[in-house]
Amino acid sequence: SRGSVLPVWRDKIAKGESVTIHDAEATRFWFTPGGAVDLVLWTLQDLPGNCMAVPSLPSFKITELAQAMNASVTYGSKRPGDKTHESMISSHESQDFVRADGRYVRGINGGALPPGFEYSSGTNDQWLTVDDLKRELESV
């Protein structure tokens, strides 16, 4: 990813411009700077050095983020390289991961994830609503 759309969209909204959505079906994970710090600290304190942790994050629809920001939206066509959904763990990687402390971890023993499991923003079981996004936007 090249980063968050938040600063770009906030700038456009402040200028009275519309934001462009290239894929109305697009979803993303909501990952705050504080969440990133918590993940790094947990990993350093609680995991052996050869492990990798992936956070369990809520997803949101990009159209609902625009709605939460009260943005005027222009729809464009999908561009080369655009992904509809973010994928944190592919189905072929998931055999190496387990669930631990509300995260996905590679490199420790434990209960395996179901065969073919994929951790994607489009198939996630945690979703932020427009109201949730409005609350989250107040703190970032």
Q: Where on the chain are the PLM-derived regions?
A:
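Strand-loop microenvironment adjacent to phosphate/nucleotide-handling motifs in alpha/beta enzyme folds
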Residues: 2-140
